Amino acid sequence: MTTKKSSYTYPIFTVRWLSIHALAVPTVFFLGAITAMQFIQR
């Protein structure tokens, strides 16, 4: 299992990590904002 492939896929800070967080953080923020707006209106 200890091959060059493991060292290639081991780093967490990759393009996939950036893309997931770039999409996840705004979605969580917008969902929280939408729910807060709905509770404030009522």
From Swiss-Prot:
Cofactor(s) demanded: heme b
Entry note: cofactor: With its partner (PsbE) binds heme. PSII binds additional chlorophylls, carotenoids and specific lipids.
Example of a GO biological process term: photosynthetic electron transport chain
Any one GO cellular component localisation term in the record: chloroplast thylakoid membrane
Domain of life: Eukaryota
Record-listed heme binding positions: H21
Subcellular location: Plastid, Chloroplast thylakoid membrane
Entry's family note: Belongs to the PsbE/PsbF family.
Subunit structure comment from the entry: Heterodimer of an alpha subunit and a beta subunit. PSII is composed of 1 copy each of membrane proteins PsbA, PsbB, PsbC, PsbD, PsbE, PsbF, PsbH, PsbI, PsbJ, PsbK, PsbL, PsbM, PsbT, PsbX, PsbY, PsbZ, Psb30/Ycf12, at least 3 peripheral proteins of the oxygen-evolving complex and a large number of cofactors. It forms dimeric complexes.
Free-text function comment from the UniProt entry: This b-type cytochrome is tightly associated with the reaction center of photosystem II (PSII). PSII is a light-driven water:plastoquinone oxidoreductase that uses light energy to abstract electrons from H(2)O, generating O(2) and a proton gradient subsequently used for ATP formation. It consists of a core antenna complex that captures photons, and an electron transfer chain that converts photonic excitation into a charge separation.
This protein's name: Cytochrome b559 subunit beta
Lineage start: Eukaryota, Viridiplantae, Chlorophyta, Ulvophyceae, OUU clade
